[in-house]
């Protein structure tokens, strides 16, 4: 995986305009939809259990996010996930806040067990708690933990039989055998709610067009991080509000030149 492959994947997203079915949380719905539109994908937010299976089957990817979970939506997620599995549609899962409460942790584990995931993306604490490893979490944000994030990602990939993306100061993405480290992004991403959730949906957009889901996830992480760096530069010292707008603009404009110059991806051990 290299910058040119990330560029190629971005071009495929923009040419195909893939439909990404999101069952996500109420905090981030608008930002997620606008971010996908800016990137070049086509978002749909369909939550009713009476239609989620039909929608998932016609989508390019299904994204499940438990940020504001409730029993009705969890049921819809599992229905949609199983329908996507039957149709060969990639399923991307964001176990927001896994480890914060027993119900949230149990829900993350149940979804990961009931649905064959293509990619799971979260911070180290969320991924660790989803697979039963010990890691502290603060609300729905990453807490303090000790341990090797690469080893954690590989263990999760093998246990869940999926690609795992652990995001933080450095991003790690692995299928348990091949691992990539991405060193792009900007601290202002942590000052705007929903940037992690949007990233998960962006991975969905790439997985819809690049069937090698490891490469799809890696490409999404590189491009997302480069866009954040561009946005921070353009926003200057204005703060997170201006950054949020600049970031949507950057997602729509980022291209081959910026990715070639600023993309920082390397293969790990």
Curated annotation (Swiss-Prot):
Residues annotated as binding substrate: 45, 194
A Pfam family of this chain: HK
SUPFAM superfamilies according to UniProt: Ribokinase-like (SSF53613)
Alphabetized UniProt keyword annotations: ATP-binding, Kinase, Magnesium, Metal-binding, Nucleotide-binding, Thiamine biosynthesis, Transferase
EC number(s) recorded for this UniProt protein: 2.7.1.50
GO biological process, one term: thiamine biosynthetic process
Binding-site positions, ATP: 121, 167
Primary enzyme class: transferase
Required cofactor names: Mg(2+)
Pathway: Cofactor biosynthesis; thiamine diphosphate biosynthesis; 4-methyl-5-(2-phosphoethyl)-thiazole from 5-(2-hydroxyethyl)-4-methylthiazole: step 1/1
Superkingdom of this protein's organism: Bacteria
Catalytic activity: 5-(2-hydroxyethyl)-4-methylthiazole + ATP = 4-methyl-5-(2-phosphooxyethyl)-thiazole + ADP + H(+)
Gene3D superfamilies: 3.40.1190.20
Stated family: Belongs to the Thz kinase family.
Protein known as: Hydroxyethylthiazole kinase
Species whose genome carries this gene: Geobacillus sp. (strain WCH70)
